[in-house]
Structures are given as C-alpha cells and as structure tokens.
C-alpha cells in the first residue's frame, strides 16, 4: 500500500500504471542524484527503432534550476510566453476528438477554480527539485520522436515506482534560449520536452485527475 508518489515504492505494474498522474506542485524534499541517475537508466530501457536511442537528458537541479526558475518567472511577469523549439500548435490544429479532450480538461480546471493558480505554478516549474530536459538532434527522423515519447513515458513510470511524482510539460521548455545558456545545450539539438521530478506535495492541484477515453473509441478490431 502507501500513497502514490510520496516516497513509497511499488512492485505491481498495474498499480503503477493506474496510479501515476501529473504532479503540479512538488514538495521541498530534494531528490538524490543517485535516484535521478537510476531513473534515467531505467528510462533507457524504452524500445527504440534499430536501437537508435536518439535522446539525451540534461538534468537541472539545485542552483542551476533555481536560476532557470528565476528567469522563467521574470519572463512571465513581462508577459513573455516564449516559444519551444517544437512550437506551440493551436488547438484548432488538433483532431475533433483531441479538442473534446482538451475542452474537458479546461472545464475541469474551471470547475475547480484553479486556473490562475495553475498558471503560477507552471511559471515556477511546478516547484520541482529536478527537471529532466530531453533533447534530440535537429532533423532527426520522425520515428525518433516516437522513441523519445516512449523514453519519457518510461521515465515517468519508473519515477513513480521509486516513490516520486512527475509531470511532462510544454511550459518547461518554452524558453529554450534560457535552457541553452544554463545547460550548454547545443543549437544542433531540439529541446523537445521537460519532465519535472520530485515528491508530491499536499497541494489541491495534485488532486486534479483527468479521465481517459473509453477503449471502444480507441481501438478498432477487424470484425
């Protein structure tokens, strides 16, 4: 038993899979480098086409992350929304079904009255003690993005299995120029996604749980 994402570990895969959720406010408890290293090592077990493993992790913690957070907050105060290396697609560019899911999420935020609070914690990088910024070379195969998604998902699952919470978010990478300066990320690489890691706090934002589509709308069988 135990409480998900707050230090307890699990061996049951179904429990890990169904209990993991996005943590939007982390506690002040630090995460050791050994745990972070093991999380990345485990994530590397994700499947990769022809074993390309076209990914790299820049892990920001302590003073470096504090400086990045301060710059993000300063830019937010100026109204600078930034733009990630992969851009920000407009909602209308997504399918009708995806737009329905997005609307449901925004309705949930509105119903809970936490929209403004959520924007604030995003600017603070969710108060995470560690953020993994995941990159791959510019011009890499589109298949490599699929691999990187698997790597990211595996990272979040193994983090939860080790008692940590996580969230993968666009807002973590919306100021790539700041990240390149502090983490020495070359211009030849795209900063694809960030994954915040840490221990879950008691904040009510962490009680937000989205629903998943019914399987009958997701899968089509041949008869």
Residue ranges and their predicted role:
Residues 1-10:
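Short, Lys/Arg-enriched N-terminal segments with co-localized hydrophobic residues
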Residues 50-61, 171:
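Short loop-to-beta-strand entry elements in the cores of soluble alpha/beta enzymes
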Residues 14-29:
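Generic N-terminal amphipathic, Lys/Arg-enriched alpha-helix
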Residues 54-55, 128-131, 191-192:
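Short, surface-exposed beta-edge/turn micro-motifs
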Residues 39-45, 130-182:
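Small-aliphatic-rich amphipathic alpha-helix that forms the alpha element of a beta-alpha
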Residues 59-141:
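Glycine/small-residue-rich phosphate/adenosyl-binding loop
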Residues 49-52, 123-126, 185-187:
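Solvent-exposed alpha-helices and their adjacent loops that cap or buttress functional pockets
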Residues 15-19, 90-103, 190-223:
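C-terminal helix-cap and adjacent tail motif
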